[in-house]
């Protein structure tokens, strides 16, 4: 069964167990001389290693049939890359704890080809209308060089993937569970979205081997891969305990760019993003901020354009129309306090609507923080 296996094959066996990180596999190799010797060693020879892990490893090894697992992957068109492979995405390879193996469907080469334009877009699973609109406007303002990475969960993740596809951008999804036969471990409602990502030339990737259980502890591991694949991470909306905060933390630990969208101080879904901004994270209120933060020159076709006034209500609803009318009465320039008083709207609604209007190029702010109405309106 183990005849004619290369050192790469034995690396695959160890990585497939999901018991050892890349650093630990390296230590095992150094201790035994080769991974083949480690695999064939008796349990007594493993005394230098943690007993509970050794017990799990020998239980795994007893039931592991390499040819069966490789055939399963091949039959279901599930590909894999090892950390020691040349094609392994370099952005991911350069984080503190890169996964020793990744399983994927689709075109994983995008992760390398578009690494300088790779952007993680993450946020709350229970996204607000504000969060969804902001994600939509921001992604619509990016050109086709960008690769959008997210986690295929509900809320902002779903919005990020859909808007990328709608705007002709490639997108990749990172799962918190395994790839299985015709089943993708994501919300059932996103099954066809996952298929669409692959059909449109994107990819779905995970570090969890087939048949493994989906556990709560999987998701922080997934979040580190989302951040690790990308040059920058944008948090659109996040509550106090949102996993998106952890993704931002992983990105910062990897010396990647971290950005956040300002939100209402009254919104539970903006506690995380507003805290990130307090911690000197770059604020994003329009696509041009993403280009600036990532050091990418904006394509002429994506420079902010003023939207037709007929679309204002569609973009920002009745509140948007009220704010525009207020600014017209105030000679197209006003403080936020003046707008609130004039519109008879509460503060959170004014702030959230202004952000949408800014993203749409309908209003802007000057150095004093005053709101300016577009000259074309």
Regions found by a protein language model. Give the residues of each.
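Glycine-biased, small-residue-rich flexible motifs in mid-sequence functional cores and linkers
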Residues: 2-6, 82-377
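Short, small/acidic-rich helices and loops at N termini and domain boundaries
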Residues: 1-86, 260, 360-369, 373-376
């Amino acid at each position: 069964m183990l005849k004619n296996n290369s050192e790469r094959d034995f690396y695959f066996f160890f990585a497939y167990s999901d018991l050892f990180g890349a650093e630990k596999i390296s230590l095992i190799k150094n201790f035994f001389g080769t991974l083949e010797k480690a695999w064939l060693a008796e349990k007594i020879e493993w005394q230098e290693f943690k007993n509970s892990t050794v017990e799990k490893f020998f239980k795994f090894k007893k039931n592991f049939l390499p040819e069966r697992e490789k055939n399963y992957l091949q039959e279901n068109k599930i590909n894999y890359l090892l950390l020691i492979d040349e094609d392994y995405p370099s952005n991911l390879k350069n984080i503190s704890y890169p996964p020793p193996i990744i399983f994927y469907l689709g075109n994983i080469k995008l992760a390398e080809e578009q690494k300088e334009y790779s952007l993680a877009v993450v946020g709350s699973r229970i996204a607000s209308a504000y969060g969804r609109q902001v994600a939509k406007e921001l992604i619509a303002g990016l050109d086709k060089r960008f690769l959008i990475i997210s986690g295929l969960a509900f809320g902002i993740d779903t919005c990020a993937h859909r808007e990328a596809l709608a705007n002709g951008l490639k997108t990749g999804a990172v799962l918190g569970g395994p790839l299985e036969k015709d089943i993708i471990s994501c919300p059932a409602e996103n099954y066809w979205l996952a298929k669409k990502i692959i059909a449109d030339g994107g990819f779905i990737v995970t570090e969890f081997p087939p048949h493994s259980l989906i556990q709560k502890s999987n998701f922080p591991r997934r979040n580190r891969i989302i951040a690790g694949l990308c040059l920058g991470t944008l948090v659109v909306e996040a509550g106090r305990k949102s996993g998106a905060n952890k993704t931002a933390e992983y990105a910062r630990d990897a010396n990647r760019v971290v950005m956040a969208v300002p939100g209402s101080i009254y919104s539970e879904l903006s506690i995380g993003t507003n805290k990130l901004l307090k911690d000197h994270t770059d604020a994003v209120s329009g696509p041009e901020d993403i280009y600036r933060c990532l050091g990418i020159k904006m394509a002429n076709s994506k420079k902010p354009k003023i939207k037709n006034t007929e679309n204002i209500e569609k973009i920002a609803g009745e509140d948007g129309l009220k704010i525009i009318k207020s600014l017209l009465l105030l000679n197209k320039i006003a403080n936020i306090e003046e707008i609130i008083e004039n519109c008879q709207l509460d503060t959170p609604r004014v702030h959230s609507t202004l952000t949408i209007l800014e993203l749409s190029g309908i209003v802007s702010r000057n150095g004093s923080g005053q709101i300016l109405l577009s000259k074309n309106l």
